C-alpha cells in the first residue's frame, strides 16, 4: 500500500541499484515511525526534479529529499517498463466527453494585499499515503501588504567623541516576559564584541555603535534589537513590533552622545502571513463537511509586506519567509506557529468555524508570540543590515523576487536580496536560526560603476536620462550632482525632484526614463559633475541541485546566471544570457526574474530571460530580441549555455514594454517519466514556456533530442491565447492518474494500437499498458513496444481507445493475450492565469491543447472567469483524490474584488476544484 516505498524499490531495481539498498529505509530521514510520509510542497518543490536514468549517488540523495517525494506524489514517475502503477488510480467513472468550468470551492479575504505577482502559497500534506487530512493538511498564503504595525525605536545622536570606557545600554521588555539588557562599552582601540571604537570622526562613532548592537543579537526571539546608522545618528529598533515589547535606554557616554525619546511600538490590523486548514471544504459534499476553511493563524509578522513565496519545514510546524521593512530592509523570518483562537484576532473567532459566513481573520491578526496568549515563536534575522552591512550598519536592501530555498539535508536556507547578495542561514528549522558565515553573504552580482549622463530632460511627469545604460526596469538608480539651468527651464525644485534614488520605467541602450513629479518641464539641466549610479542587480530565487552537485544556481535582473558551491565560492564562470556584444539586451522586465529549474538527473537546467538577442527558432520583429528560454548544462565546476529558444513572436512585444515579467518553464508529465535522453524526439518529454506583452500571450512546447532542447517549437505551433495586454502567471502542470482499466483486447497495425476496454479515457490522456503478453497473433517484439511506455490517447470511445506507436509487425486475429492486462492513465493539465482575454484561470490539456496552428488560440477545455481579479499569482496543486474538494489548486488574486471573497473590497485566497477536469 505504501506507494513511495514501492516506487523506490522499482526505481532502484530498474537501474541496477538495489544491491546494498534497504528500500524500507527509502525516505528514512522523514518517514514517521508509523509509516506516514509528510510532503511539504512550496515554490521550490518543482525547481529540482528527477527523471529516469539517475545515478546511484543521486538515488542515495533522493532518500531524504522531500522534493523527490513531492514529484512522485504528483507524477509517480517510475521508468517505463517497470510495471509500477505510477499513481494509485481511481475506480472507473463515466466516459468523459466534455468538461465544464472549474468551480470555486472557497475564497477567503486576505485584506489589503494579496500574494505577489509570480509568487505562490505553500501546501503541507501530512501523509501522502493516506486520505487527505482536514486538520493536519494546511496551506500558507504570503500577503504582500504592510501590517500597520510599528517597531518600538529610539534614536541616539553623537555630537563628538565620547570618553573611552563609558557605557550605553538598551533594555527590551516583552509583555509578561523577562527584561534583557544589552550593554555596550566605548573604546579607543577595540571594535569587537561588546566594545565599539570611538574617535573624533562622529559618523564613524554612529556606525561602530550600531554595528556592535547588530553583532550581539539576543538568542531569544522577543528580545532582539537591531540598529541602523545614518550620519551621526543610530536608530535602535525592537524586532518584535507592537505594544507587547517596550524599549528603555541608558548611557554614561557623556555630553557627546544622547538618546532621544523612545517611540513606542504600535499594533496594526493587516496580516502578512496566514494559514488555513479544513481545506477540503466547499459547497455540496466535501471531505471536511464545511463550507469554508478555517484559519490556523493570522499573523501581522513584523512591519512590512511579504513579497515572495514562503518555504515549509519538513515537520510542518515552521515557515520561513522574507519581510521587507522600509527602515531595516529584508528580514528573514523563521516562524514556529501556534494554533487555536490565540493565533488570530478575537473579533474573527466567531466566524472562523467553517460555516457559511466568510472568516475575516486576515484583518484581525495577532503579532506572533507577542500578542497575549499567542504560543508562536517568530525568529527574525535582518539580512543586509546585519550580515552584508555588518561594518557600516546601514539599512539593507529589500527582497523583491528571491524566495528562501531550504536545503533539508543540511538545514540551510539560501535567499537573495535586491543588492545582489546571497545569504545562508543554518540551522533554520532544527535549532536557533543563525547566519552561516564563511563566504556568506556573498555579493554574486556586483554594483556597476557610476556613469556620466550627457543629457537630462523632463516633462512634468517623466524624466529622460541620456546615458550608456545597462539597467533593468525595476532596478534602482541614484542620480546625483544635477544642477539648475534656468535658461533651459530647469529650476531648483526640478533638480530636487530629479536627484536621488529613482526606479527606471523604460530604457534602451542609450537612455532610461523614470516617473517623477516635476514642477516645470525642462529641456535640459546642468550636468557638470553629475553621476548616474546603478544599484546592484536584484537576485532571483536561489535553487540548489540537491540531487547532484549540491551547487547553488541564482540569476539576476541583468540576465546573468551564476553557479556557486554550497560554501558560497564561485563554482563556474557566470553566463551573461542577455548580452549581444557589449549591449545588455536582457535588461528589461527584470532580466531573469524567476529562479532556475534544475533537472538533477540529466545535469541541465532552464531559465527564462525577459529579452535575449540570441534566441533561435523563429524570426522576431522585436527590436530587442525574444523573451528567451535558455537550456544550460552544468557539472560541479562548469556552466554552459546549450540552447536559446524564442518564446515570443515579436507581435507581443515583451522585450520593448515594461510590466510583463516572464517566468520559468514547466516540464510536462512525459518529461518526468521518459526523460530527455533519447535520440528520438517521440521518446522524450517536452517543456513548455510562455511569454506575454502588449500584444497578447503565447505558449510554446519544446522537444528534445539526446538531452538537447530543440529551439523550434513542437510541430512549429505557437498558440496565441489572446491579443490584449495581460500579465501571465507562472505555469503549473499537474498529471492526474485517474483511470484504471481492465483491458479486454489489444490489436495493432504497424503504427496504431487499439485497446478494447470499458473506456473512461479521453483524447490526449496519457496512458501506460502493462500485462500484455505475446501469442501466435502477437510477437514478443510487438509486446515490448506496447507494454510500459507512456502513450497519448489519439481516439477514444466508450469501448476502446487508440494510440500511435511503432510496432514491428501488425498483429493478426484477436491480437495479443490480455489476461490480467491493465491500462492506467489520465489527463496532464497545464494551469495558467490571465487578467485579459478574458480574466481567467485557463486549463489546457498537454500536449494536445498546444498543437494548433500558429497564432490561433489553444484548445482550452476548462476555464474559470468568475473567481479571478486582475490575474492570478502562481498556483500550488495538492492531491489526486476522489474525496470531495480534495483535488484542487490554490492561488491569490492580483486585484481586489467585492464578489469573489465577500462584499468588502479585498484581495482573495482562492481554491478551485479540479473535479470538473476529471
Give, region by region, the residue ranges found by the protein language model:
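Bacterial N-terminal signal peptides that target proteins for export
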Residues: 1-11
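Generic detector of N-terminal low-structure segments
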Residues: 5-6, 17, 23, 516, ...
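Intrinsically disordered, low-structural-confidence terminal and linker regions
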Residues: 9-13, 17, 21-94, 243
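Boundary/junction segments of secreted and surface-exposed precursor proteins
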Residues: 24-48, 106-115, 124, 150-157, ...
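Mobile, glycine-rich extracellular loop/lid and propeptide segments
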Residues: 28, 87-149, 234-236, 258, ...
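Extended, beta-strand-rich, solvent-exposed assembly scaffolds of outer structural proteins
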Residues: 150-267, 298, 448-528, 739-815
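Cys-His-centered catalytic/binding microenvironment captured across papain-like cysteine peptidases
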Residues: 529-532, 817-822
Amino acid at each position: 500500500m505504501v506507494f513511495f516505498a514501492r516506487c523506490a524499490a522499482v526505481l532502484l531495481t530498474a537501474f541496477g541499484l538495489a544491491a546494498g539498498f534497504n528500500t524500507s529505509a527509502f525516505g528514512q530521514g522523514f518517514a514517521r515511525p508509523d509509516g506516514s510520509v509528510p510532503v511539504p510542497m512550496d515554490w521550490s518543490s518543482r525547481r529540482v526534479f528527477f527523471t529516469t536514468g539517475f545515478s546511484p549517488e543521486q538515488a542515495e540523495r533522493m532518500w531524504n529529499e522531500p522534493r523527490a517525494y513531492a514529484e512522485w506524489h504528483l507524477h509517480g514517475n517510475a521508468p517505463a517498463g517497470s510495471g509500477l502503477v505510477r499513481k494509485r488510480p481511481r475506480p472507473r467513472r463515466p466516459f468523459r466527453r466534455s468538461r465544464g468550468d472549474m468551480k470555486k470551492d472557497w475564497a477567503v479575504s486576505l485584506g489589503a494585499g494579496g500574494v505577489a505577482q509570480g509568487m505562490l502559497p505553500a501546501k503541507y500534506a501530512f501523509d501522502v499515503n493516506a486520505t487527505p487530512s482536514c486538520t493536519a493538511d494546511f496551506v500558507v498564503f504570503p500577503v504582500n501588504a504592510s501590517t500597520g504595525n510599528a517597531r518600538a525605536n529610539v534614536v541616539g545622536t553623537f555630537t563628538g567623541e565620547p570618553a573611552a570606557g563609558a557605557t550605553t545600554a538598551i533594555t527590551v521588555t516583552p509583555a509578561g516576559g523577562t527584561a534583557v539588557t544589552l550593554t555596550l562599552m566605548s573604546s579607543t582601540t577595540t571594535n569587537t564584541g561588546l566594545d565599539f571604537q570611538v574617535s573624533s570622526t562622529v559618523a564613524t562613532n554612529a556606525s561602530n555603535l550600531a554595528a556592535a548592537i547588530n553583532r550581539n543579537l539576543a538568542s531569544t526571539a522577543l528580545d532582539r534589537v537591531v540598529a541602523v546608522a545614518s550620519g551621526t545618528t543610530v536608530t535602535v529598533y525592537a524586532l518584535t513590533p507592537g505594544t507587547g515589547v517596550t524599549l528603555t535606554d541608558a548611557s554614561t557616554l557623556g555630553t557627546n552622545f544622547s538618546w532621544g525619546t523612545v517611540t513606542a511600538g504600535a499594533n496594526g490590523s493587516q496580516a502578512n502571513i496566514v494559514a488555513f486548514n479544513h481545506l477540503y471544504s466547499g459547497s455540496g459534499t466535501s471531505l471536511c463537511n464545511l463550507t469554508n476553511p478555517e484559519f490556523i493563524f493570522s499573523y501581522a509578522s513584523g512591519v512590512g509586506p511579504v513579497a515572495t513565496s514562503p518555504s515549509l519545514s519538513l515537520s510542518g510546524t515552521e515557515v520561513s519567509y522574507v519581510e521587507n521593512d522600509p527602515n531595516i530592509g529584508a528580514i528573514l523570518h523563521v516562524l514556529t506557529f501556534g494554533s487555536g483562537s490565540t493565533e488570530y484576532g478575537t473579533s474573527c473567532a466567531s466566524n472562523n468555524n467553517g460555516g457559511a459566513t466568510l472568516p475575516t481573520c486576515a484583518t484581525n491578526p495577532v503579532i506572533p508570540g507577542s500578542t497575549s496568549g499567542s504560543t508562536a515563536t517568530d525568529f527574525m534575522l535582518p539580512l543586509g543590515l546585519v550580515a552584508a552591512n555588518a561594518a557600516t550598519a546601514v539599512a539593507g536592501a529589500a527582497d523583491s523576487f528571491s524566495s528562501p530555498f531550504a536545503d533539508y539535508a543540511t538545514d540551510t536556507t539560501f535567499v537573495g536580496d535586491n543588492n545582489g547578495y546571497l545569504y545562508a542561514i543554518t540551522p533554520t528549522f532544527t535549532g536557533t536560526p543563525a547566519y552561516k558565515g564563511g563566504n556568506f553573504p556573498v555579493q554574486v552580482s556586483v554594483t556597476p560603476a557610476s556613469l556620466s549622463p550627457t543629457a537630462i530632460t523632463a516633462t512634468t511627469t517623466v524624466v529622460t536620462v541620456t546615458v550608456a545604460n545597462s539597467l533593468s526596469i525595476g532596478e534602482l538608480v541614484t542620480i546625483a550632482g544635477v544642477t539648475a539651468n534656468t535658461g533651459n527651464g530647469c529650476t531648483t525644485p526640478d533638480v530636487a525632484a530629479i536627484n536621488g534614488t529613482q526606479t527606471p520605467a523604460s530604457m534602451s541602450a542609450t537612455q532610461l526614463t523614470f516617473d517623477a513629479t516635476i514642477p516645470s518641464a525642462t529641456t535640459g539641466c546642468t550636468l557638470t559633475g553629475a553621476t548616474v549610479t546603478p544599484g546592484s542587480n536584484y537576485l532571483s530565487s536561489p535553487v540548489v541541485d540537491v540531487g547532484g552537485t549540491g551547487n547553488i544556481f541564482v540569476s539576476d535582473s541583468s540576465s546573468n546566471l551564476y553557479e556557486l558551491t554550497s560554501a558560497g565560492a564561485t563554482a563556474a564562470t557566470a553566463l551573461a544570457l542577455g548580452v549581444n556584444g557589449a549591449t545588455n539586451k536582457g535588461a528589461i522586465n527584470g532580466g531573469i526574474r524567476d529562479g532556475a529549474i534544475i533537472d538533477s538527473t540529466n545535469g541541465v537546467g532552464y531559465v527564462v530571460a525577459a529579452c535575449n538577442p540570441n534566441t533561435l527558432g523563429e524570426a522576431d520583429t522585436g527590436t530587442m530580441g525574444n523573451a528567451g528560454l535558455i537550456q544550460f548544462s552544468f557539472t560541479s565546476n562548469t556552466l554552459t549555455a546549450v540552447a536559446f529558444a524564442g518564446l515570443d513572436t515579436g507581435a507581443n512585444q515583451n522585450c520593448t514594454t515594461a510590466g510583463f515579467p516572464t517566468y520559468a518553464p514547466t516540464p510536462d508529465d512525459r518529461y518526468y517519466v521518459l526523460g530527455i535522453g533519447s535520440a528520438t524526439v517521440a521518446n522524450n518529454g517536452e517543456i513548455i514556456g510562455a511569454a506575454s506583452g502588449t500584444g497578447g500571450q503565447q505558449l510554446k512546447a519544446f522537444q528534445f533530442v539526446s538531452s538537447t532542447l530543440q529551439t523550434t517549437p513542437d510541430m512549429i505551433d505557437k498558440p496565441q491565447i489572446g491579443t490584449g495586454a495581460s500579465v501571465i502567471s507562472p505555469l503549473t502542470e499537474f498529471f492526474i492518474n485517474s483511470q484504471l482499466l481492465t483491458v479486454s483486447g489489444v490489436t495493432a497495425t504497424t503504427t496504431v494500437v487499439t485497446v478494447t476496454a470499458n473506456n473512461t479515457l479521453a483524447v490526449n490522456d496519457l496512458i501506460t499498458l502493462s500485462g500484455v503478453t505475446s501469442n501466435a497473433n502477437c510477437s514478443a517484439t510487438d509486446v515490448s513496444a506496447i507494454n510500459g511506455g507512456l502513450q497519448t490517447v489519439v481516439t477514444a470511445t466508450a469501448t476502446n481507445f487508440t494510440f500511435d506507436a511503432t510496432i514491428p509487425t501488425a498483429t493478426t486475429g484477436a491480437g495479443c493475450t490480455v489476461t490480467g492486462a491493465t491500462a492506467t492513465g489520465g489527463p496532464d493539465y497545464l494551469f495558467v492565469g490571465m487578467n485579459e482575454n478574458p480574466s481567467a484561470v485557463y486549463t489546457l490539456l498537454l500536449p494536445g491543447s498546444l498543437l494548433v496552428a500558429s497564432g490561433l488560440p489553444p484548445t482550452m477545455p476548462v476555464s474559470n472567469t468568475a473567481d479571478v481579479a486582475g490575474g492570478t499569482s502562481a498556483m500550488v496543486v495538492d492531491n489526486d483524490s476522489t474525496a470531495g474538494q480534495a483535488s484542487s489548486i490554490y492561488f491569490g488574486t492580483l486585484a481586489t474584488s467585492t464578489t469573489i471573497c465577500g462584499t468588502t473590497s479585498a484581495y482573495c485566497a482562492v481554491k478551485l476544484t479540479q473535479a470538473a477536469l476529471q
